[in-house]
Amino acid sequence: MRRRDGLTAIAALISLATILAVPAIVRSQAQPAVAALPQAWVLPPPAQVSPAQTIAVRAGRMFDPRTGTLLTNQVIVIRGDRITDVGPNAQIPAGARVIDLSRATVMPGLIDSHLHVMDGNPLTAPGGPGIIPGTTGAAGANTLGLQYRELIALVNAQRDLSAGFTTIVDLMTHGGWYGTVDLRNAINNGLVQGPRMQVAGPGIVATNKANIAFPLINESPIANLGAQVANGPDGVRAAVREQAHYGVDWIKIYSTQEFHFEPNGTMVNTPTFTLEETQAIVSEAHRQGLKVACHAYGGEGLHNCIQAGVDVPTHGVDLDDASVKLLLEKKLPLTSTMFDLSMEDAQEVKRWGTSRWRFMEKSFKKASAAGIVQPFGSGAGPFPHGTQVDQFAYLVKWGKTPAQALQSAMTVAAQIIGWQDQVGTVEKGKFADLVAVAGDPLADITEMSRILFVMKGGQIVRNDVK
């Protein structure tokens, strides 16, 4: 499998980063508007943060996700890329740069635990689609080329960062092979600006009637959704080892793929992998030190995921009682993406009389009522990156308190991705990843759609606080 094409694109971007500027994207009319993001779509490479650099942030209000409450008149002291002190009595060191957010609400940087940076249309106009036609799956990889999609990935990742998502998890490249591995490495090495990233590669799917495998230029099998095809316990183990070799953090599998709605309104989800195959994937991934996320809408495919012990089942559009019981027994979370499903609501209702979006609302509320852990995951890609902050309002609309909605993208998500000792709270020793809004998000959750300040690792990404 090829992955060097992604690095070629990254290298080209270094010289373009400081001169490329285009209008900010505008949210689809179907969604609430978000605060205007910076004009430059490609941010300049990050300045090297000196270990001796000292910053003091005066926070008029600070959300503490550990307690779900607002603290007042806090001082956050930052040295280099880490927080060294925080509290009402924290001393501001002599010579420190002081950032005045005394009229704002400061929070930990946000975490989106499920999105796709190689998907999505950064050129979206008002009311336009999130996806550029032909940019996803194997067709997209062939039509546009991996280099072009790497450019899309960088722009999308930077829009996520500018919107406040200082940490993201990319769960499948949809035909982009290992481009996200290269992007993650380029960000970590300081070549380009971007959020902290954990990434999956092309994903793995079993042969089934919903996908027809065909070769790319390098003759590696790939499904029509842009995933690697593997079958049988030995075959899936080999696929996991191969993806581990290329440097992924996660293995993404499709436990269901084809779905439809019956005339009586029930949802039918066809499983792909058997339980034995799913167990082999999980066993091999964990042996390689990788986490596993499974795409599963419901039924047998979702049951197999949970029973096999994947780290994060995703979607759960048609969540039955058996799945709820299994999730609780296994103490597993469920990432319920929302906005990605909303994009096709109208056409699905026209075709079937119902939709995944409508099923998702019921299933989300069911999982929440049962006490299943629900990290923030947007599925960004089918809709424009950087606009998923609007999902906070839906979390509240669907039953979460504002504090719970915020926690889902902070402490909850940090725990799920295994970075709870690095991000997710404003604490001594953690990365200096901060966001701020003008108002009180506990009183008005739509404040999250108006992020005004973003800091990642002690470096200010944007500051629009008046």
Give the role of each language-model region.
Residues 287, 356-441:
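His/Asp/Glu-enriched, well-ordered alpha-helical/loop segment
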Residues 121-124, 180, 209-211, 261-263, ...:
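Histidine/acidic-residue-rich catalytic or RNA/ligand-binding cores of hydrolases
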Residues 153-179, 194-203, 248-259, 291, ...:
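Divalent metal-dependent hydrolysis catalytic cores, especially in the metallo-beta-lactamase
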Residues 119-148, 207-224, 259-272, 328-357, ...:
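Active-site gating loops and adjacent loop-to-helix segments of metal-dependent hydrolytic enzymes
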Residues 182, 233-255, 260-334, 355-373, ...:
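Histidine/acidic residue-rich metal-binding segments in metalloenzymes
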Residues 104-185, 189-191, 207, 308:
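Metal-associated gating/positioning segment near the N- to mid-region
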Residues 40-42, 47-53, 62, 67-107, ...:
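Histidine-rich, glycine-flanked metal-binding segment
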